[in-house]
Curated annotation (Swiss-Prot):
Alphabetized InterPro entries for the sequence: GPCR_Rhodpsn (IPR000276), GPCR_Rhodpsn_7TM (IPR017452), Olfact_rcpt (IPR000725)
The name this protein goes by in its record: Olfactory receptor 10D3
The organism's taxonomic lineage, starting at the top: Eukaryota, Metazoa, Chordata, Craniata, Vertebrata
Naturally occurring in which organism (per UniProt): Mus musculus (Mouse)
Residues spanning the membrane: 27-47, 58-78, 98-118, 140-160, 198-218, 240-260, 267-287
Xref: PANTHER family: OLFACTORY RECEPTOR
């Protein structure tokens, strides 16, 4: 349908977190430490992986990638949210809104793909230990990492294009604390059914395929672990995988709640989105370091000023 006298929207107003008027200062004081911990925790893991030669393995290569994307994912939405909680402008330009939506889904989908690759890495290490160095050589690791970036870029480009090729002529108040598909589409001045269906299918398909591949890897891993005769060997193998499984559960729960509900609950979606944007990226460093002796040793050496070390 052709739209006449369309006054194109050049900026949006982020209405923020619903039902929190008057609590902005409290929320700022609450959220700022979460964001700071996310940055410090993920930088610490990245420095540990780079500086410790013991951690120059495929598993830690992908963990370092995950730390970078966790910092980026949280930084896409949190700084703007913290600014408006401080009483600064809630305005976001059209171009910045497009960028925010693109990078949110770009980094978020990369994490899904990366969890899948990390599950395959654990499968190769536990089920094929003798061939592990061949299966996961440096070229394959780099190819898998680049593959996750390219897939994430394609996935996000589709979602962003579908959302912003629609005309936005009237209301510009986004009932959310950042630009995301469920909050932006209701403002469009045209039929959004196609964009909604494709977005639902795209997010659902990516999540489902990644989840099934992870499930397949861990089914094979479980069968392999149960065949280990040594109790100590079984415990060590399960311990290696448990951190990854906890991180996967933390990542997939919010995706299902926010994007794959037949009738979304806006308030529930906002709460879960905050947990996904703030708490999830902060938890990953804790999940991986608290259960990982090698990372803890590397961090202790860095803290004691033993920086880049070649460890025997």
């Amino acid at each position: 349908m052709e739209i006449k006298n369309c006054s194109v929207v050049t900026e949006f107003i982020l209405l923020g977190i619903p039902h929190t008027e008057g609590f902005e200062t409290l929320l700022f004081v609450l959220f700022l430490p979460f964001y700071a911990c996310t940055l410090v925790g993920n930088v610490s893991i990245l420095v540990a992986v780079i500086s410790s030669t013991r951690l120059h393995t495929p598993m830690y290569f992908f963990l370092g990638n995950l730390s970078v994307f966790d910092m980026g994912f949280s930084s896409v939405t949190c700084p703007k949210m913290l600014f408006y909680l401080m009483g600064l402008s809630r305005l976001i330009s059209y171009q910045d809104c497009v960028s925010q939506l693109f990078f949110f889904h770009f980094l978020g989908s990369i994490e899904c793909f990366l969890y899948t690759v990390m599950a395959y890495d654990r499968f190769a290490a536990i089920c094929h230990p003798l061939r592990y160095s061949v299966i996961m050589n440096s070229k394959i690791c780099v190819a898998l990492a680049v593959g996750t970036w390219l897939l994430g870029c394609f996935h996000s480009s589709v979602l962003t294009s579908l959302t912003f090729t629609l005309p936005y002529c009237g209301p510009n108040e986004v009932d959310h604390f950042f630009c995301d598909i469920p909050a932006i589409l209701p403002l469009a001045s045209a039929d959004t059914s196609l964009a909604q269906r494709v977005s639902f299918t795209n997010v659902g398909l990516v999540s489902l395929v990644c989840f099934l591949l992870i499930l397949l890897s861990y089914t094979r891993i479980t069968i392999s672990i149960l065949s280990i005769q040594s109790t100590e060997g079984r415990q060590r193998a399960f311990s290696t995988c448990s951190a990854h499984l906890i991180a996967i559960l933390c990542a997939y729960g919010p995706i299902i709640t926010i994007y794959l509900q037949p009738t979304p609950n806006p308030m529930l979606g906002t709460v879960v989105q905050i947990l996904m944007n703030l708490v999830g990226p902060m938890l990953n460093p804790l999940i991986y370091t608290l259960r990982n002796k090698e990372v803890k040793i590397a961090l202790k050496k860095i803290l004691h000023g033993k920086g880049s070390v070649s460890e025997g």
